[in-house]
Amino acid sequence: MLTNIAKKIFGSRNDRLLKQYRKSVARINALEEQMQALSDADLQAKTAEFKQRLADGQTLDGILPEAFAVCREASRRVLGMRHFDVQLIGGMVLHDGKIAEMRTGEGKTLVATLAVYLNALAGKGVHVVTVNDYLASRDAGIMEPLYNFLGLTVGVIISDMQPFDRQNAYAADITYGTNNEFGFDYLRDNMVTDQYDKVQRELNFAVVDEVDSILIDEARTPLIISGQADDNIQLYQIMNTVPPHLVRQETEEGEGDYWVDEKAHQVILSETGHEHAEQILTQMGLLAENDSLYSAANISLMHHLMAALRAHSLFHKDQHYVIQDGEIVIVDEFTGRLMSGRRWSEGLHQAVEAKEGVEIKRENQTLASITFQNYFRLYTKLSGMTGTADTEAFEFQSIYNLETVIIPTNRPVQRKDLNDQIFRSAEEKFEAVVKDIEECHKRGQPVLVGTTSIENSELVSRLLQKAGLPHNVLNAKEHEREALIVAQAGKVGAITVATNMAGRGTDIVLGGNLKHQTDAIRADETLSDEEKQAQIAALENGWQAEHDKVMEAGGLHIIGTERHESRRIDNQLRGRSGRQGDPGSSRFYLSFEDPLLRLFALDRAAAILNRLAPERGVAIEHNLLTRQIEGAQRKVEGRNFDMRKQVLEYDDVANEQRKVIYSQRNEILTSKDIGDLMQEIRSDAVSDLVDTYMPPDSMEEQWDIPTLENRLAAEFRLQEDIQSWLKADNAIDGQDIKERLIERIENEYAAKTELVGKQAMADFERNVMLQAIDNQWREHLAAMDYLRQGIHLRSYAQKNPKQEYKREAFTMFQDLWNGIKFHIASLLTSVQIEQNPVAAVEEQPVGNIQSIHSESPDIEELLGQSQTDLVTEAFNPDGTDFSPEALEARGQIVHRNDPCPCGSGLKYKQCHGKLA
């Protein structure tokens, strides 16, 4: 009550922000005539002027009015589009690191140019993030002429791009790409073994298009770079036969072997189910008699069994995945798009492959991972645009510290949002949907039908075919035709059936998208220039009449075939209609068989239905029902927010560890001299080993000197008689022994370094350290996954799972770091340097030299080899010998950065130059 009164008196936070921004809009508008009077050359020169002013100490905020005015005028000249006042507000919101909520059709792509241009002037790079490669390429292509006119370069990151091209794209002032590509490049950059192989610069400023889709819908899906793990493919096939023998329970307390919790998307095996499964696996010979699935030795069997149960019970064909070219391809539940190349983890993908009888590919082991939540928080400044952010404003603020500002529309919204119609059964609902479509089609009103799954879109398509209504289907299976179908969805009488419309990225123009049609004609090589001009002229003349006819028919009509779990997705579907003041309408058709009503609103809604008791085919429209459904959606949104928050809380633990590892790794990559770090690592490793067998402040009787001597010999090749030291000097203690051992190791290491050269040893140290960190980090990630999967069981012991996870993860990380240091010290001190004479090799013609990029030899393999063997195997695979002296005898000098004459493709300093 008091809050509402305060808002009426002082205005809301959003109103106050808009009032401030409008003052800046007035300053920008005051510069418009001045900018229009400039020649093209003078307007272009403004970019260099702004950069100089920034170098002289001015801030981006200080030059904002002028920069925005320049960008608007350049856009008018180059693109033929002038920014509206509300678009200027949107640009300022983005520059301030906030989220701009703008309705569909309000020109978000053009709005971004203002903030992007201003921030690109700082020279630190700007990333424009989109949801797919098509939109990244399209938006970059549209806006590149504007940025080029203003003296800025544009790059595009798309999948399958080579590293060199990626480096060039990131070096540009403005880089377009998808959230996946930006995230994966960050992970790959932290796996390189040469700093010059990195592609990204510092993460400075990002503008995220469809920010709710990327930062919320995909927040629970981590980006993972993985390699194949050793796995038994046959076990998935065997386990696939088990679920049909188990009985599904109707309720959690019912009789049966397992229960499916659809809300939590989990399968729970009952005690009876465990016993039944153990009997089946014992009969198959996978489980020993009287053995238990709970035992540590059988954890893999349990893992495979649960994956098979989830595959059979929770993941359904044409809803969660499709089969394409003999492969399981995941369907994005939020957008309906195919996610080629993505695979479910934890053996689930293999279990689904076994269920569908397609080729089973090996399970992957995580090499590096990060969530979008933690990746995008790495940017110095982050902003975003979307048509629907207000319902998730609290989450944006609490997780990303992003405030949402609702930008007013340029013209008032004319769309009519009609009441939901609710039916008893899905059959009645779809009959009503077809009837509504038929009526719209008769009067020439275009219709967009939104479904939540491929299965439902194909069902609607079959019903429309039966009714003789021509239509287009837009789902994951029709991805290639997507833009064309959406562009023409506003034509007279057009019927378009689509899975979730989130992130489609193409406006539906009433009367059809004229630009798409004219572009298609211009691209048609079978037509002459005269024919193209004639067809384009005819199109332009006929378009206005068609546009007017659609306007008279009521504009685009939206039909939702069920409510999504999130109100935001429903609003995105509605938002396709009524763009830029156009007329339009929307209505949702629901049934009590819909998942949302069945799972979250059934009891109260069913009671209301029984009281109203309509006849078959008669819809219910009641405010109480609508409120009940919205309450169910809010409940689901709250549950999903809690799940995303929980994912973040757990990932924050791994994220802090990731920062430490990546920071240390980067220091090793970029440091010219890592001698001090190596000395510290050797010292720590020896000290830790001595402390293990000679604990500080302990009695001499507690020391285990023989084992210490054995470990020193095995780990560091130190043959020391410590017992004789103790006999010779009664006053000696653990610290004295550490100092003697460290001195001995340092002397031996200095001798090795002198033998091979300081630079060669530094390169070798760097490679060993990076491989050790990567290998141990990979194993640590797997251990963290296992810890995470079972940590919830601690709650049964009255312990807080999150606190337990943090505590154990910290201990594991300490062990990881100590293990890395010990491994590095052990390996490098154990390496033996031998110098054997090497014979000359016959000189190869230049044309036969091949550049090959082979994997480095495994560290474990290096341990048992001499240095000469190592060089022969790693740098001269064919076993031939090579002599730098032989070349010098023929008067040929090989410089350090020249290709090595042995034909390995490596630089001489990285190959046989190490022996020279």
UniProtKB/Swiss-Prot annotation:
Residues binding Zn(2+): C900, C902, C911, H912
Documented EC number(s): 7.4.2.8
InterPro entries assigned: Helicase_ATP-bd, Helicase_C-like, P-loop_NTPase, SEC_C_motif, SecA, SecA_CS, SecA_DEAD, SecA_motor_DEAD
Superkingdom in the source lineage: Bacteria
Catalytic activity: ATP + H2O + cellular proteinSide 1 = ADP + phosphate + cellular proteinSide 2
Bilayer topology annotation: Peripheral membrane protein
EC primary class: translocase
Residues annotated as binding ATP: Q87, G105, E106, G107, K108, T109, D507
Any GO molecular function: ATP binding
Pfam family, one: SEC-C
Compartment list: Cell inner membrane; Cytoplasm
Phosphoprotein keyword on record: no
Keywords in alphabetical order: ATP-binding, Cell inner membrane, Cell membrane, Cytoplasm, Membrane, Metal-binding, Nucleotide-binding, Protein transport, Translocase, Translocation, Transport, Zinc
GO CC aspect terms: cell envelope Sec protein transport complex; cytosol; plasma membrane
Cofactor(s) the record lists: Zn(2+)
Cofactor note text: May bind 1 zinc ion per subunit.
GO biological process, one term: protein targeting
Keyword Disulfide bond (UniProt): no
Family that this chain belongs to: Belongs to the SecA family.
Oligomeric form and interacting partners: Monomer and homodimer. Part of the essential Sec protein translocation apparatus which comprises SecA, SecYEG and auxiliary proteins SecDF-YajC and YidC.
Role: Part of the Sec protein translocase complex. Interacts with the SecYEG preprotein conducting channel. Has a central role in coupling the hydrolysis of ATP to the transfer of proteins into and across the cell membrane, serving both as a receptor for the preprotein-SecB complex and as an ATP-driven molecular motor driving the stepwise translocation of polypeptide chains across the membrane.
Name of this protein: Protein translocase subunit SecA
Species this protein is from: Neisseria gonorrhoeae (strain ATCC 700825 / FA 1090)
Name of encoding gene: secA
